[in-house]
A protein has these predicted regions:
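The feature marks the mature, well-folded catalytic cores of soluble enzymes
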Residues: 1-86
C-alpha cells in the first residue's frame, strides 16, 4: 500500500487551502506508509485531483469523467489535455 498525494486547489474556487497540502506528509508520518506525489510534466508542481472526482479499484483501474477533469470553469491543471492525463 502506498499513499498517493495528489495536489489540491480547493476545487479551483477558493484561496484558503495552503494547509491542505501538508496532509500527505502528516498521514505518512503517522502510518509509516510511503508517499508518492505525481508531478506535472511541465515541472510546476503536483497533478491536481480531488476525492470524489476519481474512482479506483486498487488494481490499476481508474474512472473519471472528461467533464470534471477537463472543465473550463474549474481548471485543475492549466494546460493539461486529455492526452496528458491518459
Amino acid at each position: 500500500v502506498q499513499l498517493v498525494n495528489w495536489g489540491f486547489n480547493a476545487w479551483a474556487k477558493y484561496d484558503n487551502y495552503a494547509r491542505d497540502s501538508r496532509i500527505g506528509a502528516f498521514v505518512e508520518s503517522h502510518t509509516g506508509l510511503s508517499r508518492s506525489e505525481p508531478q506535472r510534466h511541465d515541472g510546476t508542481g503536483r497533478v491536481i485531483l480531488e476525492g470524489g472526482g476519481i474512482e479506483t479499484d486498487g488494481r490499476g483501474t481508474m474512472l473519471v469523467t472528461e467533464e470534471w477533469l477537463l472543465s473550463d470553469v474549474q481548471v485543475r491543471n492549466p494546460g493539461f489535455t486529455r492526452a496528458d492525463y491518459e
